Design a protein with these regions (language model features):
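Glycine-rich phosphate-binding loops of nucleotide-dependent enzymes
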Residues: 1-231
Length: 231
């Protein structure tokens, strides 16, 4: 479904990704792991057309090269950045409305689905998004991305700064998305959560892929964890 082959990325003259290759299959959660500065977020931005790239990025067999971010989104890839990127002066419900593809109703997700999945958002649907807690904002960012009816969600650090109970909820909801056939590229620092919910793990370091395997294989590889993941 999503395939990166020897992908390079640049910020101006800075060469930050060096031949990244990875795949995300239909209905799969792939955890993209690594320390800060390893290239994980840049990989997400490269997929979404937000940075200059060389190499191959394809989605469902079609090249993403030269496409604008909104064109990539319209093809079925949603991106939830680390800063969540919600509209703080709009209400929860208005944020969800803006997530709809071209203003059209999602074929897969309804407002009721969102409020059933996250009951707290139903209670806060007329509240400005800027006054929500961090956990509520993360729920809103995820739900807004779903309203565009994506097939793949790239989500960057969804558990950053959240209470343990909310972290568990986010993990449960990502698994629920997988159960409904969505693919997830999960950029995550919390190794325990990543190993618990992913089917494959990709570890990055210095802008390159340094490990790819199953969660069990990563658990068994103490050298990789020590070299590339431990703080």
């Amino acid at each position: 479904m999503l395939r990166l082959d020897k992908l390079h990325a640049f910020y101006g003259k800075s060469h930050v990704l060096h031949g990244v290759s990875l795949q995300v299959a239909p209905g799969e959660i792939v955890a993209l792991l690594g320390r800060n500065g390893s290239g994980r977020s840049t990989t997400a931005k490269a997929v979404m057309g937000l940075v200059e790239t060389q190499g191959e990025a394809t989605w469902k067999g079609r090249s993403l090269a030269g496409l604008k971010p909104y064109e990539i989104a319209h093809r079925g890839i949603a991106y939830v950045p680390e800063n969540r990127d919600i509209f703080p002066r709009l209400t929860v419900h208005q944020n969800l409305q803006l997530g709809q593809k071209g203003g059209a109703r999602s074929a897969r997700w309804s407002f009721e689905d969102m409020y059933t999945m996250f009951p707290r958002l139903r209670e806060r649907q007329h509240t400005e998004a800027g006054v929500l807690s961090g956990g509520e904002q993360q729920m809103l960012a995820l739900c807004r991305s779903l309203m565009g009816d994506p097939e793949l969600i790239i989500i960057d650090e969804p558990t950053e700064g959240l209470a343990p109970k909310i972290v568990e909820l986010v993990a449960e909801y990502l698994l629920a998305l997988k159960a409904r056939g969505l693919s997830v590229l999960l950029i995550e620092q919390k190794l325990t959560i990543a190993l618990e919910i992913s089917q494959r793990c990709v570890v990055m370091g210095h802008g390159q892929v340094v490990f790819e395997g199953t969660p069990d294989e990563l658990r068994a590889d103490a050298a990789v964890r020590k070299e590339w993941l431990e703080v």
